[in-house]
Each structure stands twice: as structure tokens, then as C-alpha cells.
Amino acid sequence: VSSGTPKETVTPLVVELWYAEAPELGDPRLLQALRLQWPATELQMESIVVPHGDPASPLLTVIMTASPLGEGGKALPDVSQTWDWEGAEAAVSASRCSLLVTEMFGDGRTPQERWDAMSAVVCEMAQLTRPTALSWPQSQRVGDPELFAAGDLDGLINVRYFSISNDPGAIVMDTLGLHVFGLPDVQCHYRDREPGEIAAMLFSTAVYLFRSGDVIADGNTISGPRGDERFVCIHERALLAPSRQVIDVDLGEPYAAGQRDRR
């Protein structure tokens, strides 16, 4: 890890399930179905609480009704950085209300432990309640609920794409989502390469960080998409919002864009 580079703050995971008409969280049939998987599931203060692991110190998944559209700036999710679901815009347009799924007591747990717990509940809720769309506000991605499975990292980690208006041909791509675990995302500022191959490289690197931690030190290299390519990595602040730590992947000449200090 780059010395002197501040670590990100760990924040609770959030997944939003969108509906044309939201299910009633107090429905005994819903609670009964969840208890088949998690027997200690309870209805508390109009929220469903699902405990995982040690009963004395459980990781909790909490399901609650989200604020209505328009209240406090509440809006439908943005689909502009969702690239792999053609039906995203139509599904979101048909949505009118949502449930929030979040977590409590995630500190001290590995990213895998936290996501295994959260994603299992999201998957079960998607099967039981049939939402129109899943939204990951922390990664700016919208997903098809019918394709989501427990443990899937698609959605948790999103690869974004931006063209740079004042530098024709230059592109910035980054991952978004690892910052909630206190881990760096991955970015690449480049030109004249196929975006699909860069996206695959960034996603696979982000998955490696998710599973292994922030183990890519400044000056280390990762494999590129083509044959024996090796690209140097360095920690820095993200070029694009939200402000966070990233690992920048330098494609070298002639593909790297922007200004770099390679001393």
C-alpha cells in the first residue's frame, strides 16, 4: 500500500429494491419465508432484521421502506452508468417506490463476509417480492433482479465510462463500489484502446482487491489484456467523483492519457 495515502472509511452497504408497488414488510408470509433461511429474523420498528453468524455478536441485514419519491430529494436511480442491461431505463421508469436493504455491525468483518450476508438476503427478497429493478447507489449501477444471484459482484462493483470533453479521444474508466469496504477502486485514463478490454481488466483487478485486500503496492504491475502486457499501478485520489482513493493503472506510451509523474 502506498505510504502516506489515507485509507477510506468503511461505510454500510446499501442495496435498493424498486417496485411498482412495494410489498408490506409486516406480511406474515414474507417473514415466514425469510425465517426458513434465517430463523432468527424479526420485525422490529417496521423493519425486518436478519441476523447472521454468532448470535452474541451478529452481523445484521436490515430491510426497511425507503422514503417516497420526491421527499427529501428522493429520485429514481440513474441508469447512465449501467451498460449491460438494455431494459434498465424501462424498469426504472415503471418503478414508484422502494425498499432499502442495509447492514449493521459490519466493522471488523471481511468484505466477503459482509457481501455474502447482504447478497443472500437481497437474492431471497428478489425471488419473494419480484422487484422491477435492483439499484446499487454506492456503485451507480442498476441491475435486473431476475439475473441476480447470491454472491454476485456485478452491481456491487460497477465499471464506469467517461469521455473527456477538453481532450478529444481521451477516456477515463473506473470502478466504483470498493470504497465502502475501505478499499481503493481502480481507474485508467487512456486513449486508443478498446473500452471493453479495459473494462474487463479493471473489473478483474477490483475483484482481486475485494478478495485479497489492498495488496497492490505502488510500482507493482498487473497483467494487461494483450499477451505479455504489464501495467504499472499507483495509488492516488480519483479523477472523478466521488472523491476516494483509487489505484491508477498506467497503460504507458502511446495509450496513457493525462499528465503523469513517472519518476
Each predicted region: which residue ranges?
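Aromatic/basic-lined ligand-recognition segments
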Residues: P137-R263
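Short acidic, S/G/P-rich loop/turn micro-motifs used as interaction or catalytic elements
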Residues: P23-L25, G106-R109, R193-G196
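Internal, hydrophobic cores of structured domains that mediate oligomerization or house catalytic pockets
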Residues: M64-I164
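Structural alpha-beta junctions
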Residues: L36-M45, A120-L134, Y208-A217
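Short, well-ordered alpha-helical segments
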Residues: P28, D116-S119, G196-M201
